[in-house]
Curated annotation (Swiss-Prot):
Protein name per the record: Serpentine receptor class alpha-34
Domain of life: Eukaryota
Top-level taxonomy: Eukaryota, Metazoa, Ecdysozoa, Nematoda, Chromadorea
Membrane topology: Multi-pass membrane protein
Location(s) in or outside the cell: Membrane
Amino acid sequence: MNVSTPGFQRCATENEMIGRTAFLFQSNVYTNNIIAIITWTLTVVVLRKLYTKSIFPNSTLVLLVASLAVGSIHEFLYGFIQNWSLLRSLVYWDQPCKIMFNEYECYPFYTANIFIRLLMICTNCAITIDRLITLSNVGIKSTAQRGIVLFILSILVSVGVCMYMTSDGPNDNLQSNCFQRQGRNIDELTTQIMIYLYIIAICLSLNTIGWFISWRNLKKDKFNLAVQMSKQESINSSLVVTWYLVSQIIFLGLYSILIYAVIKLKDVIGPLLVTNVVLWCYTYTYACMFLPIIILTSTKIISLQRREKINGLTKENQNENQKSYFDKLDRSWSQGYGNRYAPNVPAPVVCINSS
């Protein structure tokens, strides 16, 4: 538990007042509000599509829906934290002793934000594990119960890691918002970010290996349609998860790089801008927005591929039926022609001489 800082200030400094009322901060909140609205709208569209079209296995479907829900909750929680900060900055723009937050009032929201971020990552890992289970044995049936169990496990892991990361508790420091804690050790923050990246990188590697295995297995049993369809379904699901995890690594990696750059250039950026620049470096909101976009795009691609395969099979079947029909017609015509127009040769007359 952190101890109180002797002589801590309960009122904002002049620099903090400038940062709290800056356009750089306000525009960031407005931008993230727009991103949240887009995320929620696309999530509704995706959920309706997933409900009406059978594209993913049951377990993967449960986990994808859970991932969409977690992303939407993250957008709501982060939006609440930032809009609360914006409201206070607008109402108390000229009252330095009321415009700031303390860690005791922010601690529940700060902890919840860390938990939801961990749950985002752990849910992705659960999807990867689900894919590996299916790819290890195509005969294993994908059930909704398995998806629910994996999601519950991801919740338990997120709770445990979150409790470890926030075990020091709140202190008496002032904060400009309930998203970031001021006065934290830089090495601790860097380690936290790297843990996120390590977990996602491992999940991406495992999913890539699984996708390669399923692609290789698809080359076998080409004449077993049921096995081919099951394997193709596994490839489609793995490919969607891979695309999603790649986007997560891009955004979270970018967040880590930007935070590292801010730490190194904090003296150049200046105390007036550092806090608000960090807000613009937060890319989790973009990661949440890209999940429904990736699912929409991938389902569209999968649907087009299915349609092409169906059209190809239908055309092949039609050609086969037409060929069979004309072959049969040809045989029938030949037989009919032979019977009808066979030369009329008189039967030989056999004479029997009687003696």
